[in-house]
Amino acid sequence: KSDVRRMGIGVRHAGDDGASAYRIPGLVTTNNGTLLGVYDIRYNSSVDLQEMVDIGVSRSTDKGQTWEPMRVAMTFGETGGLPHAQNGVGDPSILVDEKTNTIWIVAAWTHGMGNGRAWWNSMPGMSADSTAQLMLVKSEDDGKTWSQPINITPQVKDPSWYFLLQGPGRGITMKDGTLVFPIQFIDSTRIPNAGIMYSKDRGTTWHLHNLARTNTTEAQVAEIEPGVLMLNMRDNRGGSRAVATTRDLGKTWYEHPSSRSALQEPVCMASLIHVDAKDNITGKDLLIFSNPNTTKGRNHITIKVSTDGGMTWPLSNQVTLDEDESWGYSCLSMIDKETVGIFYESSVAHMTFQAVKLTDLVK
């Protein structure tokens, strides 16, 4: 209901810690119940890479009511004799290995490229001098400290691709323990395509098979039943989300019946999570989705719930959080069995956190 006013918490604002802007939220809940919000620290301006950008993390141990001082999880400083603004790293995606509580962040590091946009200036090849690098960091202490970056570009990038990067937001641990991050790549014909990458050995080695759909970019992944992954994609065709499923970790993909019809979008990042019936108060298997619920502009940030595997998203199962214009990116994570958290780019703070009761969402 639009007449309900919900309290949000501004976690990051323009100017905090001397940074011009904060963008690209990711959110996870660790095995200990800690909330970790991740984002770009865009020091000089709000523009995308290449720029002076690091990966920041905000941590909450009280279900999002208060947040610890920002930590820098990934930075490349003056690597290779180039200034910090020529070593930006951005668009983070974060996951919790639910078997070990190791937390992984994947981000794209760009080296050189002047001040051109990486989307157009990353080139085919494998080296940092030619193409963006896919970098991981991990935390073994619930998000307090982070490892040195690990370069997995050689494991997963095709040399003919112009740009390989993650799908910003979050990844998942599958029921069988497989770690999965959404990815996107600009292929040799300069068409972007969404997909996934996965690890079967707790994050040491990563694999990437086939694209889910052409001309798609930022995606989020959910395990809708054991071994079955759903990828919900930003589609450059506009108007509506693309949705595909795979049973073999991305070797083969099938268009979902809801694709390009059930969820409207203005061509923007969105969030999707699956919650098992046993893990939430409703006793139903839930898919929870958030995005700007519009086809024009980025406004009306809305959380929607489907109880039929993503086929329908009834109006009764929707809550609008922010009607005004913003950058519009969001990420969802369950806080406890009764509550979903959302970390999003709002009209009032660059990184806003809100907690919404499932009883308000599932009627």
Summary of predicted features, one role per range:
Residues 1-363:
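Asp-box/BNR beta-propeller blade signature and adjacent active/binding-site loops
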